[in-house]
């Protein structure tokens, strides 16, 4: 996911962004969907706009639509928050962006492993996710993009395989997807990712989502019986993530205590 967003920020920025242009993200983004755009903002002198949320950890859709101007060039928003569990109305958000002729990047790192996602139904221009989030190897992931957009973007890195012809005067680049795959690919990682996707597909994403919802509801209700418990993120549409604090106990201390009891938390 991280490398995919960096690739898109770099290539899209090189092709389409100029000083004064705008990129929209949300307040609930992972650092991987903030820092690449901040780096781009420094290089290209563009503006980063942020969609706010309400007390239930839901994005304010009215405020989102107000952020668009004729300088808005791309929207990049997380599908499911890795901290709050909020499932954002991505399909609706994409439609709004397209009404303004603006492409949309979906960070699906937290949704692909936990629910059925259809890029064509969403009409996403770009979608990214990580292999290790879906029980595959680390260091490998997926960048999906509509062919019309990928053809417009310059290569992110140079090297073998992403070229057709090289001379000291000029280089011509390979067709998709090889244009964005410089050097020797991670054959082992991609094979492992394919097996992981086969594994969750065989179980059924609907079954996974239903079971995780049941566990999340049970855990939430049990946690609420603990004195001083504070749960963050109570959106109407919520994934299987629960963030909490207990009284004034520092989260590091709580994590250490739970670890000693054999309970894993993040």
Range-by-range predicted roles:
Residues 1-266:
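Pyridoxal 5′-phosphate
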């Amino acid at each position: 996911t991280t490398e995919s967003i960096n690739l898109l920020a770099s290539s899209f920025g090189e092709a389409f962004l100029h000083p004064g242009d705008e990129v929209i993200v949300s307040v609930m983004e992972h650092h991987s969907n903030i820092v690449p755009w901040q780096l781009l903002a420094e290089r290209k002198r563009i503006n980063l706009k942020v969609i706010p949320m309400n007390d239930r950890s839901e994005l304010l859709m009215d405020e989102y639509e107000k952020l668009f101007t004729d300088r808005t060039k791309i929207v990049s928003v997380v599908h499911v928050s890795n901290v709050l569990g909020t499932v954002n109305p991505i399909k609706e958000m994409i439609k709004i962006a397209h009404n303004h002729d603006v492409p949309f990047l979906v960070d699906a790192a937290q949704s692909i492993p936990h629910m059925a996602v259809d890029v064509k139904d969403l009409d996403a221009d770009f979608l990214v996710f990580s292999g290790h989030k879906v029980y595959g190897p680390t260091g490998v992931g997926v960048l999906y993009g509509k062919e019309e957009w990928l053809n417009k973007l310059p290569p992110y890195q140079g090297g073998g395989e992403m070229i057709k012809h090289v001379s000291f005067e000029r280089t011509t680049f390979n067709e998709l997807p090889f244009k964005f795959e410089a050097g020797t690919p991670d054959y082992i990682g991609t094979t492992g990712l394919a097996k992981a996707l086969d594994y969750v597909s065989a179980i059924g994403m609907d079954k996974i989502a239903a079971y995780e919802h049941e566990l999340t509801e049970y855990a939430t209700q049990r946690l609420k019986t603990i004195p001083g418990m504070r749960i963050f993120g109570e959106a109407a549409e919520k994934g299987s993530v629960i963030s909490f604090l207990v009284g004034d106990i520092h989260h590091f201390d709580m994590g250490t205590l739970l670890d000693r009891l054999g309970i894993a938390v993040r």
